[in-house]
């Protein structure tokens, strides 16, 4: 009975397992979510430790606890850096279930943990450490790119370079700010637009022109004015900048996808796993003729792998308004939903191939166990069938997208309003900020609302 309960528990997706925490976040009860995170026993195993650090760090940030939040993001960074594969556990996970692997994060999750560290530091007014954290964000993306064979992937983070430019900008280092902004522009043009459909932020264009004009890069000013069809504008006298980040909604969650493959015997010890509808054929080496017959006798094999499901954000766009009703539109800087889908799509064949290999290894183990002990073989056969489960773990408190703007406000205490627009309403959130001469004020805000789930094509679905 204990075994059966354990297997039923394992069948729940990662999203279902933390339903209480998610409900607290959805209802805006961040204090309760923080308390539940402390009691979440399923976070304690090492294989889920990184997710505990990431989710706890995000909730603490939402609660305005920047210092405590960064302690968890530092732990997350060290965990990823120090992780070394446990080959015994790794072998067991191939045979039983990928969920037994230690989770070290999707590539974009490893990159974006440094976004939160950076935002925490800028909100604390610590620009030097913010610069270090942002450079770690870029270094992480470069390190991940070194391991990618197919370069037509999410491999460079445009928003990281954009954010780096904002920090240099705030420090008065306009030369390095311009370089960072220009690097960001190139990545938006070369990677983000064709791969993710993310447009170049209008604010980035304005910042490139402004910093170029500030350091008298006349040729660059003329070049980009023509390219952007904009005029370079400097900071107005008596004003100082406010950089406002809006984390909109919540990023996608992982669910399980599965398809059936038909098995066909091949030559030289191989069995072909074929799905005609998807146009897929995976030749897997099985071994002797007896083992091949056992695998092909099954005829149809179910294979599971993870897929993302969108949490459709309630708010579609937003503007910032000052006390004089000047309007500053927020641009999408990072479409995390699109990045998540692209990252998983890029390795779909690898995921399916590993799932098929896992099935073949399980069948070999069952056959070997039956030779030794019929009862043990039967038990392993049941375990093999029950354990065919995709790894649905992911960092579930990332936003759907990161949006931002730069507003120029008069020196002194100011009241600003963030207006977020849905299909049928506008919500207003008020902020009081102290604008100081010669300083950049950084603010960040999260909206959590979303309107159900959708597949990668935008079709609405019922997840659970």
Residue ranges and their predicted role:
Residues 8-32, 41:
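Bacterial Sec signal peptide processing site at the extreme N-terminus
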Residues 219-464:
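Short loop/turn and low-complexity linker motifs enriched in small/turn-promoting residues
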Residues 45-49, 80-90, 143-150, 185-222, ...:
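Boundary/linker segments of alpha-helical solenoid repeat arrays
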Residues 70-81, 121-122, 135-139, 169-193:
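TPR/TPR-like (Sel1-like) alpha-helical repeat modules
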């Amino acid at each position: 009975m204990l075994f059966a309960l354990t297997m039923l528990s394992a069948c729940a997706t990662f999203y279902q397992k933390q339903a209480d925490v998610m409900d607290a976040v959805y209802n805006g009860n961040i204090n309760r979510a923080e308390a539940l995170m402390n009691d979440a026993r399923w976070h304690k195993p090492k294989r889920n430790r990184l997710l505990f650090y990431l989710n706890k760090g995000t909730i603490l940030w939402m609660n305005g606890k920047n210092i405590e939040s960064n302690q968890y993001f530092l732990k997350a960074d060290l965990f990823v850096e120090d992780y070394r594969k446990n080959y015994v556990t790794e072998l067991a996970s191939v045979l039983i279930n990928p969920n037994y692997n230690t989770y070290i994060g999707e590539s974009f999750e490893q990159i974006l943990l440094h976004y939160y560290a950076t935002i925490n530091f800028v909100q604390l007014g610590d620009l030097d450490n913010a610069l270090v954290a942002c450079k770690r964000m870029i270094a992480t993306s470069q390190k991940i790119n070194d391991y990618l064979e197919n370069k037509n992937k999410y491999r460079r983070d445009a928003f990281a370079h954009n954010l780096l430019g904002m920090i240099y900008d705030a420090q008065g280092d306009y030369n390095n700010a311009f370089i960072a902004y220009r690097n960001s522009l190139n990545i938006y043009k070369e990677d983000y637009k064709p791969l993710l459909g993310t447009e170049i932020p209008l604010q980035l264009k304005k910042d490139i022109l402004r910093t170029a004009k500030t350091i008298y890069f006349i040729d660059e000013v003329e070049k980009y004015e023509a390219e952007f069809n904009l005029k370079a504008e400097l900071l107005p006298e008596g004003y100082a900048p406010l950089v406002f980040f809006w984390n909109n909604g919540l990023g996608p969650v992982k669910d399980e996808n599965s398809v059936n493959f038909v098995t066909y015997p091949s030559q030289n010890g191989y069995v072909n796993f074929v799905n005609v509808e998807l146009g897929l054929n995976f030749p897997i080496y099985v071994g002797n003729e007896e083992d091949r017959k056992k695998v092909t006798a099954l005829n149809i094999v179910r294979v599971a792998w993870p897929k993302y499901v969108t949490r459709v954000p309630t708010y579609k766009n937003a503007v910032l308004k000052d006390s004089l009703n000047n309007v500053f539109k927020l641009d999408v800087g990072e479409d995390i939903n699109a990045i998540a889908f692209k990252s998983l799509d890029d390795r779909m064949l690898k995921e399916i191939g590993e799932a098929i290999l896992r099935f073949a290894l399980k069948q070999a183990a069952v056959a070997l166990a039956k030779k030794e002990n019929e009862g043990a073989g039967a038990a392993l056969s049941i375990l093999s069938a029950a354990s065919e489960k995709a790894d649905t773990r992911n960092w579930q408190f990332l936003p759907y997208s990161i949006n931002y703007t730069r507003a120029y406000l008069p020196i002194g205490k100011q009241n600003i309003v963030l207006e977020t627009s849905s299909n049928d309403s506008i919500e207003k959130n008020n902020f009081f900020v102290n604008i100081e001469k010669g300083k950049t004020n950084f603010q960040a805000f999260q909206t959590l609302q979303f309107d159900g789930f959708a597949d990668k094509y935008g079709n609405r679905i019922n997840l659970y």
